[in-house]
């Protein structure tokens, strides 16, 4: 990405001259510089690039300096701001008044000067003018010459930065619908007001005949196609053909060529390709400025042409024939809401995302009945034909040897090769996909932490978010095969157990499944529920269910004015302030 979003640091100060302000200048500006260094060392853009911080040219003692800072931030493409101070400052004269910029204030917990008093006064001002801000205040008192950033402050700063960068980076980008509504799936009825008002994004649309046109008229890079085909033949190994009448070799070779071309075409539709301009296709070379897209596929395409499973899976992975790269985000069946969750997960972590059907709840009794094996608890079968990134198999390893999905900038060629080797590509089940193609098939390693999440749109409320943190499990191979053969064995599988807390939707695994709001979900590697909650609060999307520890929930300070129950607070605050871009 060009012109990357920056993080603005606003050092505010007591404006009284002739001694007070002068005595605080160095400490206040050093606080800003230390914070900028900390962020630069610990936060990256989704592209893997380092984050740049922009500090105001001077400390901010009043409205004139606040305005000068705002002007600088506009010139520098600042997308979120953190105000820092060790002392009292003039509340509403010094706060960030940008209506769309996520904002936080870190008030130094020291006794010599009342940084906490300014923090409280500023939060009151933010609440009164209707611009929610995040309050950051360390639990332990620090000495005035202590330049360290306490661990609890660090955690909140990093969470705010990850979520705020997501908000600022997706603003102005596009969701690209390739096709329309798939099989009546609600998420593929693209809700333009949601994208516009909550995310600040626009919607772009192309009919699937545009992909067919580019196939027929060869509007793709032919040199890259030769490279891609050679790579695919070497690294993408065919799996078992479960069809009653196996596909012929000639048909399979034709399908391989088609799905590789489809992959290139979908990518070019999203982000453009200067090579197309060299070929005389200047309009096609521009793309649609899309950070997320969806492919309808079923059934108008897949009844006649090879399915999109290969294209979706490869694009969503962190590697292809061009090497390691940032994953794209493509939602199968054009489920735009699941696509948004995939985008959130990628933006927060830099990792490839796994799109899943929430397919089956298996109780311990049911597993024992059909396999003779009794697991420790019930679990959920997550499986989908299409856009599960190959990284989801867990073959990339941490230095400890544990299975993981890594940020793409940490992926190695060996990691990519391991994921490819663990994936088979069975010919598509023609009962589902009459036009042929191939589906990815892998099994996710057990013991991996995952966060399952999904946005749903509720009439009268708007978007709501669901979150379930948990982990993958490993079943004995024969048990896995017994259960997997009962559904479609050509698709990738993750056996998932959410973390329970004996309350509400998380009293047992069955209740998580029963309360899930749609047929699809995203699983993101790691326990990132707290980051998702912070992000949702910035966008004014309430959280319907989650199992994140209350101590990890970080929302704007003014949420505490909306009652005592945390989730009720969230709904009332989001309804009161409304979507970020209303």
From Swiss-Prot:
Its cofactor is Mn(2+). Its main location: cytoplasm. Mn(2+) binds at residues 333, 357, 520. The active site is at 333 (proton acceptor), 357 (proton acceptor). The keyword Cytoplasm applies. GO terms for cellular component: cytoplasm. Its EC number is 5.3.1.25. InterPro entries: Fuc/Ara_isomerase_C (IPR004216), Fuc_iso_dom3_sf (IPR038393), Fuc_isomerase_C (IPR015888), Fucose_iso_dom1_sf (IPR038391), Fucose_iso_N1 (IPR012888), Fucose_isomerase (IPR005763), Fucose_isomerase_dom2_sf (IPR038392), Fucose_isomerase_N/cen_sf (IPR009015). Belongs to the L-fucose isomerase family. This is L-fucose isomerase. The gene is fucI.
